[in-house]
């Protein structure tokens, strides 16, 4: 340890740091240990002089690139040498982990080794791993061996026959020779995948170009993308409907407010004209084909529109119940009605459009006439219908004769007697409703608005009157139906002699049902005539009907309940007493049985004793008196 007393010499520093050769030369060697230039855990190979490449200046590289080699064979040899020298080398040599494992398995007699045996072979046969067999320094290379065993296809794992032992590792005879194939999934970004994706792109572009050329020959229009989309989606309802899109239809994606690529079913009309010109609304009239197409597109919009009451009642609908009061007219009548409406529309002035009405003479006179015709048709239909009884469901009912004068036919037919409750409105009638309502809603004439307001007020008043008449008529009808001759069978006055019942039996039955046991109530002997209850209907006083009950048997509800509770308590006590008595009887029986058993056992013992007893008898000895006795 005396070497450490020496002072360190000041070594010259360079730009690259300290020179290791000078540092090693200055270290003292008498301390008993060799100087180590790097740690033992560093397993990277030492730099070799043949692999060292000197840096080439830019001028030298440019000069060498300008010169041509005289001998091409020499160039090939130099390239091969460079390849050999540039190959990856490990600290133990040129062999990789997979090659070492292959040698280890091949050197075994059975051509198979466990993982621990492979570790032992590495430590024994490879000089680099001799001092790295302990657990601290073997973590890295053992992990590499396990990784190579599971990674390469040349090794196969075989289950060990013994329980609790590690598996065998063997060489795979089916593995390809040469460089081992890695068991790693290939990437999706391969050349084959790129070719396939390129073909799909070309097909899509060809379809788009063909659709654009077929539909737009020379000039592109805003509907080119629409037609292209229809070609890609042949199941679209726009194909089968025969609906042709006008150039005014545009995609919503072209607007700044939306990015959806759907079609807008709204015409691109300039609702807000620019300041430079005025819009001619007369040129924007719609043809009949376009109107039908719009009806087809709207579809279920007719259900959401507020249909007028008079037009609903014309086809058999009622505003009060919401159900059709009569079946829809046959197809021929519907065609006739549609033709009449078309004629009425044709009589309108030509300047009328959906966007706005144009004042013309004669239009105000047509509307009241049409309304009068509709009202006449409604009255005729209501007169044809007949009221129906609610109780008997028959037209020729006797209970309706008295109320038929007080009730109007409108109130009976619109709400009470649905002749065909399961019928539904047809789609053609709804379409005609929607067309007529659109025409009525578009009219802005002042006189029409005044008339409509008056009609609505009148209709509301009529509805209120009808509802009042219905409520009063229904009450009268029900009362008269109850008091009619057809249900006189249920009149209590017709029962002669009254209704008789025995109160004692009734009370006993009720108590039996409540208490679930037969209870005999000690009641005094009462004449049956006095205990009979006679129920008669007092004709003079219709508001109340009484029952004459004898005074001796009148009991209030509270008294009955109290008596029932007492009886139930008595029953419970009796049941408990009975149970106690039964238990006592059982105990007595058990005692008797035990006593009988004891007696039987004693008698058996006595019998056996008498049977086995031996009777000993003394022999009778006759002694004669002595001779000297006389």
Swiss-Prot record:
It is found in: Cytoplasm; Nucleus. One of its GO terms (cellular component) is cytoplasm. The keyword DNA-binding applies. Residues 218-227, 408-417, 423-432 have a biased composition (Polar residues). Residues 332-350, 367-379 have a biased composition (Low complexity). GO terms for biological process: cell differentiation; glucose homeostasis; negative regulation of cell growth; negative regulation of cell population proliferation; negative regulation of insulin receptor signaling pathway; regulation of DNA-templated transcription; regulation of lipid metabolic process. Residues 1-45, 214-260, 318-379, 403-432 are annotated as: Disordered. PROSITE patterns: FORK_HEAD_2, FORK_HEAD_3. CDD domains: FH_FOXO (cd20032). PANTHER family: FORKHEAD BOX PROTEIN O. Transcription factor involved in the regulation of the insulin signaling pathway. Consistently activates both the downstream target Thor\d4EBP and the feedback control target InR. Involved in negative regulation of the cell cycle, modulating cell growth and proliferation. In response to cellular stresses, such as nutrient deprivation or increased levels of reactive oxygen species, foxo is activated and inhibits growth through the action of target genes such as Thor. This is Forkhead box protein O.
